[in-house]
Regions:
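Long, low-complexity segments enriched in small/aliphatic residues
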Residues: 1-50
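Long, contiguous, secondary-structure-rich segments that constitute the structural scaffold
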Residues: 16, 37-174
Length: 174
């Protein structure tokens, strides 16, 4: 199988062609402070952990970490509400500006969020923090069922408060 050679080698990501439109690589590892949704009741003590969520105007927003230089280019400051988006959807998060990520990379935990669309589900931004809305839906390889949902190409901008977001039509896996 050419997709799974005996010696592992680098293969460019299948979403690489969209990098001009969505230049930031978003990493979505397992959460540090809870396991998926267990122990994370969305209104629990976990909201008070400063690296987990940020309260803005009475709502606890999911955090997206962004390199300080990338943030400065976009006019983003610490705890600004930002729209993280690509052709699959959009999520509103609170920005955590850091030098701990290389340029071109962002980081947000993949779960423990609640889907809260601000308009028509599927055609509006989510303020609950479901970053997996932005990750690929297709299998990593043709002859297997491996998920590719730990990374995605995105763009981040200051959120203008609008609920609408046009989503590209779903495409079947190749």
């Amino acid at each position: 199988d050419p997709e799974r050679p005996p010696v592992v080698k680098y293969n460019p990501a299948f979403d690489a062609p969209s990098q001009a439109k969505h230049p930031l690589r978003m990493l979505t590892p397992h959460p540090r402070y809870s396991f998926h949704t267990q122990g994370d009741g969305k209104d629990s003590f976990i909201n008070n952990i400063k690296d987990h969520r940020v309260e803005v105007d009475g709502f606890y927003y999911w955090i997206i970490r962004i390199n300080a230089d990338d943030a400065a280019e976009r006019g983003i400051k610490m705890h600004d509400l930002v729209k993280v988006y690509n052709d699959q959807g959009a999520v509103v998060c609170a920005a955590l500006v850091t030098q701990r990520l290389p340029r071109g990379s962002t980081h947000g935990y993949e779960s423990c969020a609640t889907y809260e669309p601000l308009g028509e589900p599927g055609n509006s931004v989510d303020r609950g923090g479901i970053l997996n809305l932005l990750t690929p839906k297709k299998s990593q390889i043709k002859k297997g069922h491996s998920m590719g949902n730990s990374t995605a190409l995105v763009e981040i901008e200051l959120w203008d408060g609008k609920a609408e977001h046009n989503v590209a039509p779903a495409v079947a896996a190749e």
